[in-house]
């Protein structure tokens, strides 16, 4: 026995010298981490669930004064003041609630979702510094007072992720309603709210705005990806309630095409197009988990969590933040505390609970898909990620019967658990989750009881348990057009007035077949393209105005601006596309707006047009200035 023990010690010493992994040590380490995370999740889950609901008005224990259905970012009212409702945060939190509800029916969660829907219907109509509902611009306002009044202070506005994220959250509940026999309720209450947000997304997706961290006015990977998903899922949802979204179908492929431009040849996602940051940002990891579709495999174009690009990016983002004190000794391949981005200076730049949990969640998503498909593919793009965890791995596809497959599954799962274990280490004894924890001491920092932190924990815990959200249709919406186009569609907007849900919306006892739509929907919209040839000078713009709200009710300030992207001296073409309900009759004219704001109208008479009722999806008006 003594001799055998000595040989084992010598063998271990040789492994240490040669840098080879010790399988027994690795298994002990993973078992310890797993038990630690198991215990933390068991303890933290009821705390997180309770504290999340506490931040939702009007009955939440920390939401006194907030309107019904309002998701408060944090009860913190000073240093920092987060006593507001952000459209983005509220949507992400509600999406978590919807996912929990659809997985396990719960009347408390259902009431919370319905109150949220009613609050958002009202909020869409609140005019604010970003604009109003008349042309959709007001939907891009990032935050409001907790009593649903506008916030008029200086802020990074607009932020264009709010509308698509809200649409995604509400579509989740709408799909549950349809699948349980309540399509009429989904159409009368959920669809009008969602329709406004989809119209905003199709109209404004190509305009820059502030990103989810509210600091950079640029195109954002997170916003673009959310916009694509919303239009894809929105089109399918529209059909399920007997409606349609022509703008969704026309614009979604162009957004996905643009999304590919965020991938850097250096092997990571550039989260924002600015020249004063590296672009290595948890923004991209959050994108991957919030656009996770368990039926899409490891699709590259939608940057699914197990795609080679998403995994390569995960490594780069995590590695970029290993310099913090709390990450001392946490070398590549070991879980680390993660923040927003390495250059962050907010509160001097620190790890965030939600960011560290997002790093774990992406890996849990990947493991789920690998197990489902029974194989793992390692490419040259993702090789560095895998080598950190399984040094002997090489490019290739490994089936579930191979030892390499098993080694990867075990290593990635342990790696994911490591991120949760870090969160556990820096969670106070009462289970409260703030926004950040100090990069050196690990002490909680910034806003207390951050609602998004609790949602992030619950989401990561669910994925670890193999509980995943329904598919959003990524597998059938991942094809890229031959060339990218920055096309947009101006939308029509209307206040969602129906906000009272029927009682007893319980799960169906039998499978419900959604209604089959014949012909086109009664509210079918046609994409009407206005082409106007007019010679203009630098600084001038062209608008179309007319007798309907979508054309500004004859007010030039509210008219629709045409694009000059096809303009040339030989073909002075200005153009725009507007989604208009079939059968709509209207009069219209074009105006030239000078740089000083003065307006020149074209000559009489008024032009007139009636949108067809033949279920066509497009129509074109070719006009010349007169």
Swiss-Prot record:
It comes from the Eukaryota. Substrate binds at residue 155. Residues 1-19 form the signal peptide. InterPro entries: 6-hairpin_glycosidase_sf, 6hp_glycosidase-like_sf, Carb-bd-like_fold, CBM20, CBM20_glucoamylase, GH15-like, Glucoamylase, Glucoamylase_active_site. Pfam families: CBM_20, Glyco_hydro_15. SMART domains: CBM_2. Its EC number is 3.2.1.3. The active site is at 211 (proton acceptor), 214 (proton donor). This is Glucoamylase. The gene is gla-1.
């Amino acid at each position: 026995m003594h001799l055998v023990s000595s040989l084992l010690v010598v063998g271990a010493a040789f492994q240490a010298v040669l840098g080879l992994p010790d399988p027994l040590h690795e298994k002990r380490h993973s078992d310890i981490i797993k038990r630690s995370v198991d215990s933390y999740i068991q303890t933290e889950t009821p705390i997180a669930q309770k504290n999340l609901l506490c931040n939702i008005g009007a009955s939440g224990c920390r939401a006194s004064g907030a309107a019904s259905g309002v998701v408060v970012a944090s009860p913190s009212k000073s240093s920092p003041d987060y006593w507001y409702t952000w459209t983005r945060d509220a949507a992400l939190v509600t999406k978590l609630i919807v996912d929990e509800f659809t997985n396990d029916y719960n009347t408390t969660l259902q009431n919370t979702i319905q109150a949220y829907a009613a609050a958002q219907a009202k909020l869409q109509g609140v005019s604010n510094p970003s604009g109003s509902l008349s042309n959709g611009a007001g939907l891009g306002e990032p935050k409001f007072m907790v009593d649903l009044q506008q916030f008029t202070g200086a802020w990074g506005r607009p932020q264009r992720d709010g509308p698509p994220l809200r649409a995604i959250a509400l579509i989740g509940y709408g799909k549950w309603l349809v699948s349980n026999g309540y399509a009429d309720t989904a159409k009368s209450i959920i669809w009008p709210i969602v329709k406004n947000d989809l119209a905003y997304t199709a109209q404004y997706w190509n305009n820059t705005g502030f990103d989810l961290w509210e600091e950079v006015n640029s195109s954002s990977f997170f916003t673009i990806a959310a916009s694509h998903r919303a239009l894809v899922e929105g089109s399918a949802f529209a059909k399920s309630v007997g409606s349609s979204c022509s703008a969704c179908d026309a614009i979604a492929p162009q957004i996905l095409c643009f999304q590919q431009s965020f991938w850097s040849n250096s092997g990571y996602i550039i989260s924002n197009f600015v020249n004063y940051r590296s672009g290595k940002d948890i923004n991209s990891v959050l994108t991957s988990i919030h656009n996770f579709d368990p039926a899409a495999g490891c699709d590259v174009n939608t940057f699914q969590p197990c795609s080679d690009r998403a995994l390569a990016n995960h490594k780069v983002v995590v590695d970029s933040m290993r310099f913090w004190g709390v990450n001392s000794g946490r070398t590549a391949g070991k879980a680390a505390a993660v923040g927003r981005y390495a250059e962050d200076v907010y509160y001097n730049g620190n790890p965030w609970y939600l960011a560290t949990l997002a790093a774990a969640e992406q890996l849990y998503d990947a493991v789920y898909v690998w197990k489902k498909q029974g194989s793992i593919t390692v490419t040259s793009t993702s090789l560095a990620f895998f080598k950190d965890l399984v040094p002997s791995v090489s490019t290739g596809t490994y089936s579930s019967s191979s030892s390499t497959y098993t080694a990867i599954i075990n290593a990635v799962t342990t790696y994911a658990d490591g991120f949760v274990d870090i969160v556990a280490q820096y969670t106070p004894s009462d289970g409260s989750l703030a926004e950040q924890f100090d990069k050196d001491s690990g002490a909680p920092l910034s806003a207390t009881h951050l609602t998004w932190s609790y949602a992030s924990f619950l989401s990561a815990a669910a994925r670890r348990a193999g509980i995943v959200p329904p598919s959003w249709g990524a597998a059938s919406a991942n094809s890229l057009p031959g060339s990218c186009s920055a096309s947009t569609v101006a939308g029509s907007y209307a206040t969602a007035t129906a906000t009272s849900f029927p009682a007893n919306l319980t799960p169906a006892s039998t499978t419900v077949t959604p209604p089959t739509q014949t012909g086109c929907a009664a509210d079918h919209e046609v994409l009407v393209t206005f082409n106007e040839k007019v010679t203009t000078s630098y600084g001038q713009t062209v608008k179309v105005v007319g007798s309907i709200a979508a054309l500004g009710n004859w007010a030039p300030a509210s008219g629709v601006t045409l694009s000059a992207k096809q303009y040339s001296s030989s073909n002075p073409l200005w153009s725009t596309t507007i989604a208009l309900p079939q059968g709509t009759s209207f009069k219209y004219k074009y105006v030239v707006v000078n740089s000083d704001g003065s307006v020149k109208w074209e000559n009489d008479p008024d032009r007139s047009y009636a949108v067809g009722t033949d279920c066509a999806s497009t129509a074109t008006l070719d006009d010349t200035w007169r």
